[in-house]
Amino acid sequence: MGTCPCESSERNEPVSRVSGTNEVSDGNETNNPAEVSDGNETNNPAEVSDGNETNNPAPVSRVSGTNEVSDGNETNNPAPVSRVSGTNEVSDGNETNNPAPVTEKPLHPHEPHIEILRGQPTDQELAALIAVLGSISGSTPPAQPEPTRWGLPVDQLRYPVFSWQRITLQEMTHMRR
């Protein structure tokens, strides 16, 4: 039929239009060592392709090549694939090419805010103490009132005393709707 690499692959999955692979790709690498399509080959010698159609009649996303409405963040493979390392792990985007696991160590250990010096309080007593201390803690200071808008330099413009323009200007300047 055609020479598209997706036809010669063993899996019958949609192929990404960006990288030509069956894996997640941002277009800068391939996750499959199979041949990569540049979108210039044709499926029929009589037809010319712009690289935006597939042999599958279902609508295809132009971003990722999947057969569903796409926002560009889905994968063809149910296992998530890291864009940097290419491994099938769930990634938070902070991975490197080093496969060794990375553990974050805090700069200093967390010290408790309340220290019990004597006795063995129960969990209910500690909860009551924390609730009382939380309720008496200072609240946020009241917000500063908005400065008055009367007496602005615009009020000193020289309009006649009975001018409708002055009244309208003052209303527009000082009255918020």
UniProtKB/Swiss-Prot annotation:
Pfam families documented for this protein: ACC_epsilon
GO biological process, one term: carbon fixation
Region (Disordered): 1-112
Biased composition (Polar residues): 18-100
GO molecular function, one term: acetyl-CoA carboxylase activity
InterPro entries hit by this protein: ACC_epsilon
Gene Ontology annotations for the cellular component aspect, listed alphabetically: acetyl-CoA carboxylase complex; peptidoglycan-based cell wall
Induction remarks: Protein level is maximal in exponential growth phase and declines during late log and stationary phase.
Function: Stimulates activity of the AccA3/AccD5 biotin-dependent acyl-CoA carboxylase complex. Interacts with AccD5 and modulates its carboxylase activity for acetyl-CoA and propionyl-CoA. Inhibits activity of the AccA3/AccD6 complex. Is also required for the activity of the long-chain acyl-CoA carboxylase (LCC) complex.
Free-text comment on this protein's domains from its UniProt entry: It is uncertain whether the five sets of tandem repeats at the N terminus are required, or not, for maximal enhancement of carboxylase activity.
Subunit structure: Interacts with the AccA3/AccD5 biotin-dependent acyl-CoA carboxylase complex. Interacts with the AccA3/AccD6 complex. Is also part of the long-chain acyl-CoA carboxylase (LCC) complex, which is composed of AccA3, AccD4, AccD5 and AccE5. The four subunits are essential for activity, but AccD5, together with AccE5, probably plays a structural role rather than a catalytic one.
Name of the protein in its database record: Biotin-dependent acetyl-/propionyl-coenzyme A carboxylase epsilon subunit
Name of the gene: accE5
